[in-house]
Amino acid sequence: MEFVYLGTAAAEGWPALFCSCNACLQAREKGGRNVRGRSQALVDGELLLDLPADTFSRTLEGRLDLTAVRHCLITHSHSDHLYPADLEMRRTGFAHPADSRPFVLYGTKTAGREIRSVLKKYGLEQDGRVHFQPIRPFE
């Protein structure tokens, strides 16, 4: 099993988005390992843990190939772990997947409400591009 950390910071990221303390200024200046994105991980290249707003930047860095990811487990519905607006980019016209398998998200009812709102708005579940599967703790 391959487990890759894509982000290990808290909600504000590191350095913090609107912070100008000495630690954040130094982290910005040094870059590299001194900069951390919001929490996210990838298991065996196919299972994504969380979908934060940093997901797009991770694809640009070459650390994440979303065309290979089939499943995404949302640990909880806080905005640093779930940014459902990015699901719109799975729409016809934005995404041309190599196959027709859906991107399946798993999460609690709370996460499901946020995800389904986006899926409904863009017709993503009806066209089979994205599916939400509710789960309960310890299932």
Listing of model-derived features with the role each one plays in the protein:
Residues 1-139:
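Binuclear metal-dependent hydrolase catalytic cores
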